[in-house]
């Protein structure tokens, strides 16, 4: 008999009662090679014939089972065929189908093309929907049977359905395939969710607890599929997290003016990467704040820390609250953190002793005000702290000294009021404004107000108002002597305040983002061109120091001939710009014997007698001038600086003179610090009793900086946390040695560690140290140091466990942090670096080649192109094609290029025939990437990994899990889903 079609062949086999293997042999004779059985829909044809009657045809079913066992038909074709059966009233047919599914549902596989693997995902999704519908139908029948008094048939079928459902869903591989299918077919997943809800309603009335709990387990497994990548266990066995501690210390010490959002994101990044529970995370923030308060040097730094702790950190926590689901849960976590903090009585007592008050109470009040604590918890915590507090502290508190926390909290609303006052028209009541400014200068008011403004993000606005005021006072027309003196004072106070702000908080705070065409204010011009700063070398012969000669001559005459400075009609900005050239004339006259020392004293008294800003401008030029002089030529210039730095003992000075001189001396001391160290000179500035430059000149003399670096890191590692002083030393070393030197030497120290607990601590500390300039350090680490270690076989031994694991962890943390933040603004402490030692990454990885560099592409292609996937879309896939290219990520960005090249190197290592510690390192690196991911790799560093790396990675035993494959592929792309499906289906 000549067979015409598949249906006839099946019927002939049934009529002639062929055995299953005989059927298979004959089928292969009837249908010669060419079309596959799946294309001919063999599974569907067999099921259709087997399910014609009220009960299934056992012989035809045996053919199907044989076809499944001998892989004549694919799993996906069988699942698709089963899901088309919808007459659930035929018990025996349903049971037969469940038996067939039971044969292979926990060991699905597909070794074909990527499209076939995606087909398996879709078929499994259809089968899951069918199982849910079948379970719901069985449950309804059971209910009807219970009402009729015949529950047995329905109960048996429901048990079989749930058993098959649980077996299918228990496999992580199946759930991973369903995860991909959900992304491929969102509408089908919605149908599954509806079926699950319907099933839940039906089973709610079920009396059998065993079946109900089994159904609940299945429901939980289905609901977990969309979020199967976001489950991370938190570190409950640890109580100290040095990275958070160091990050807070770094921000409080060096970046008070920084925006809050980048800090919030960085803290959340660390919390996620290190899996820190929220209460311990908040506790670590508070601990670091109290340590900062205790160890901060007296004066401005102490006020900065107080503002950081009491004004900025509560606001940071308010922003952090938005990242957590459930506001109530977060307030409970904050309460829990305070409960832990109250157990650290010695720390809190020491802080109270330092600040002369109950520090915790002030903090609790502020958190309560910000809605971070409930009233009940607030009252309970205050009561506990009052009971635990050392009674001697209360008695030793000095009632005459107002504590800094209280002063800072009161200063914050004052800042707002001053900003409003400064908005008024200055010409209407200059005397009233002068009164406000004069009050600001007294005692430590100015530093308090500046710290409060810095911590609340108002300092830039504050500085802008003073620049506008300074600009307003540069000209005077038709003024009386009184008006002229008020104008001179307003100019002087605003100038001194702005200099003080620039030196204390960085010149970035002062600079405006002025659009082209706008006139740059006088103070900004002077600060950028004439003001000495750390790391800024000024040319004393620069045109900015050489103004109009007629103005200079008239100023020299005024200084030399007048008994005191004139005020009326004085253009103070011109005087400030002319003073440098005037000083040069006066110096030359002195050195050539034209002027005697008494005349110089009279001139310097004139310069500083009315407005201190003239003295500041004069010293600014003298500092630049002294740098250029030989050892024997400096004496007179330094003597002139000494003359200008001393106060003037005269009754004929303008208002607030003593207060202005204090600020002037602080400014001059900062200006002269570098040049005095370089010239080994001492100038005694009038002391205020407080070290105005506590973190300056910390490096020990005559010691190689590499020794200093290794020593400081060893001490930090031994202690387990970074203190403020160490942060400043490390920052100086980073400035001095450059990023490559700094990063390379610290990585060498890490690779020397052999104790596991020490390497983990070292990584946590190094990450926080690298935050001094995370972007540049990451470029060096991923672009130079890691490739050097991975490609040089003589260095592979250093990548053994534990230091290798630690380095992989550190590299991933740095990469993730830099990648997540590099689209935002660099922090103020990173922007002010002037560096020539970083290579230009665009020239390192040439930009004309929009793919990653040629060298890396050569490395990544293997001899036998085994990486190339076999479907039509796969064949066209370049071995370096990655999700980042499909997302059209900007490859001109240095970090993107470095990441792309690193992942190509990783791909080549995995595809090479040589295994070693470097291969193990790559595995640890990828494991850490997966461990740190939130939901999927879209937009993370893994988008730079070539798609072909996935098939290489699953060959590594530790990485051959469905969850890992889902994590490392970009499932938002169809190609990413195909790659993931192919890799998972082959596991």
From Swiss-Prot:
Expressed in the adrenal gland, brain, epididymis, heart, kidney, liver, ovary, pancreas, prostate, skeletal muscle, small intestine, spleen, stomach, testis and thymus. A motif (LXXLL motif 4) lies at residues 555-559. A motif (LXXLL motif 6) lies at residues 855-859. A motif (LXXLL motif 1) lies at residues 128-132. It comes from the Eukaryota. The keyword Cytoplasm does not apply. It is found in: Nucleus. Belongs to the Mediator complex subunit 24 family. This is Mediator of RNA polymerase II transcription subunit 24. It comes from Mus musculus.
């Amino acid at each position: 008999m000549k067979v015409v079609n598949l249906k006839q062949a099946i019927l002939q086999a049934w009529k002639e009662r062929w055995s299953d293997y005989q059927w298979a042999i004959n089928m292969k004779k009837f249908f010669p090679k060419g079309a596959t059985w799946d294309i001919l829909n063999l599974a569907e044809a067999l099921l259709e014939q087997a399910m014609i009657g009220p009960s299934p045809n056992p012989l035809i079913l045996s053919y199907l089972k044989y076809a499944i066992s001998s892989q004549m038909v694919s799993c996906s074709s069988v699942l698709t065929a089963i899901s088309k059966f919808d007459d659930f009233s035929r018990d025996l047919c349903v049971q037969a189908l469940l038996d067939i599914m039971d044969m292979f549902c926990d060991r699905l596989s597909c070794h074909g093309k990527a499209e076939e693997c995606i087909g398996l995902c879709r078929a499994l999704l259809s089968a899951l929907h069918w199982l849910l519908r079948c379970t719901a139908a069985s449950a309804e029948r059971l209910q009807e049977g219970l009402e009729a008094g015949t529950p047995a048939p329905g109960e048996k079928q429901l048990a079989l359905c749930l058993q098959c459902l649980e077996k299918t869903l228990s496999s992580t591989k199946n759930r991973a395939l369903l995860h991909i299918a959900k992304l491929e077919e969102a509408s089908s997943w919605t149908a599954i969710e509806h079926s699950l809800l319907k099933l839940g309603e039906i089973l709610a009335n079920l009396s059998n607890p065993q079946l109900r709990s089994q159904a609940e387990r299945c429901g939980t497994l289905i609901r977990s599929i969309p979020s199967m990548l976001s489950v991370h266990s938190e570190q409950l066995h640890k109580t100290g997290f040095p990275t958070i501690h160091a990050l807070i210390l770094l921000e409080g010490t060096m970046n008070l003016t920084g925006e809050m959002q980048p800090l919030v994101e960085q803290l959340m990044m660390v919390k996620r990467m290190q899996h820190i529970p929220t209460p311990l995370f908040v506790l670590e923030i508070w601990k670091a704040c109290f340590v900062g308060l205790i160890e901060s040097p007296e004066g401005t730094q102490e006020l900065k820390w107080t503002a950081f702790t009491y004004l900025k950190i509560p606001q940071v926590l308010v922003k952090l609250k938005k990242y957590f689901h459930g506001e109530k849960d977060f307030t409970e976590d904050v309460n829990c953190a305070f409960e832990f903090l109250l157990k650290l009585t010695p720390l809190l007592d020491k802080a109270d002793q330092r600040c002369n008050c109950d520090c915790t109470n002030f903090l609790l009040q502020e958190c309560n005000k910000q809605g971070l604590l409930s009233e009940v918890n607030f009252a309970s915590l205050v009561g506990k702290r009052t009971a635990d507090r050392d009674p001697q502290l209360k008695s030793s508190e000095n009632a005459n000294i107002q504590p800094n926390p209280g002063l800072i909290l009161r200063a914050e609303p004052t800042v707002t009021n001053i900003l409003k006052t400064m908005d008024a028209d200055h010409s209407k009541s200059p005397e009233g404004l002068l009164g406000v400014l004069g009050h600001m200068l007294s005692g430590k008011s100015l530093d308090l107000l500046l710290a409060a403004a810095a911590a609340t993000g108002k300092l830039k606005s504050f500085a802008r108002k003073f620049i506008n005021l300074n600009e307003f006072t540069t000209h005077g027309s038709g003024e009386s002597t009184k008006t002229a003196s008020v104008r001179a004072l307003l100019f002087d106070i605003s100038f001194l305040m702005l200099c003080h702000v620039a030196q204390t908080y960085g010149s970035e705070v002062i600079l405006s983002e002025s659009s082209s065409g706008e006139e740059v204010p006088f103070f900004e011009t002077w600060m950028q061109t004439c003001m000495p700063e750390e790391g800024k070398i000024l040319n004393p012969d620069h045109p900015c120091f050489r103004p109009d000669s007629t103005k200079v001559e008239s100023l020299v005459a005024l200084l030399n001939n007048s008994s005191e400075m004139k005020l009326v009609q004085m253009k103070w900005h011109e005087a400030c710009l002319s003073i440098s050239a005037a000083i040069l004339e006066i110096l030359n006259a002195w050195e050539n014997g034209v002027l005697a020392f008494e005349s110089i004293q009279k001139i310097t008294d004139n310069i500083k007698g009315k407005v201190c800003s003239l003295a500041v401008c004069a010293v600014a030029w003298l500092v630049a001038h002294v740098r250029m002089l030989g050892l024997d030529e400096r004496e007179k210039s330094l003597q002139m600086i000494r003359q200008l730095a001393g106060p003037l003992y005269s009754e004929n000075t303008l208002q607030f003179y003593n207060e202005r001189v204090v600020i002037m001396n602080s400014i001059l001391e900062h200006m002269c610090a570098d040049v005095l160290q370089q010239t080994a000179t001492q100038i005694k500035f009038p002391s205020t009793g407080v070290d105005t430059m506590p973190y300056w000149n910390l490096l020990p003399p005559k010691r190689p900086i590499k020794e200093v670096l290794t020593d400081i890191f060893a001490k930090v590692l031994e202690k387990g946390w970074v203190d403020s002083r160490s942060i400043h030393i490390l920052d100086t070393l980073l400035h001095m040695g450059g990023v490559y030197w700094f990063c390379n030497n610290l990585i060498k120290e890490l690779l020397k560690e052999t104790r596991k607990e020490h390497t983990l601590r070292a990584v946590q500390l190094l990450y926080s140290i690298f935050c001094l300039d995370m972007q540049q350090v990451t470029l060096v680490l991923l672009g130079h140091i890691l490739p050097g270690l991975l490609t040089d076989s003589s260095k592979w031994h250093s990548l053994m466990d534990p230091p290798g694991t630690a380095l992989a962890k550190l590299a991933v943390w740095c990469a993730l942090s830099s990648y997540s933040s590099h689209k935002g603004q660099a922090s103020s402490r990173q922007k002010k670096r002037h560096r020539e030692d970083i290579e230009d990454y665009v020239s390192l990885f040439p930009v004309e080649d929009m793919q990653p560099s040629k060298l890396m592409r050569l490395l990544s292609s293997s001899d036998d192109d085994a990486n190339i996937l076999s479907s039509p879309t796969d064949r066209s896939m370049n071995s370096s094609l990655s999700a980042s290219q499909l997302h059209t990520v900007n490859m001109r960005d240095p970090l993107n290029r470095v990441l792309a090249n690193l992942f190509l190197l990783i791909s080549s290592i995995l595809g090479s025939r040589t295994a070693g510690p470097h291969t193990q390192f790559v595995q640890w690196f990828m494991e850490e990437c997966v461990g740190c991911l939130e939901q999927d790799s879209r937009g993370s560093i893994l988008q730079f990994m070539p798609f072909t790396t996935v098939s290489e990675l699953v060959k590594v035993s530790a990485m051959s899990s469905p969850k890992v494959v889902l994590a490392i592929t970009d499932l938002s792309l169809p190609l990413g889903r195909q790659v993931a499906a192919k890799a998972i289906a082959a596991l």
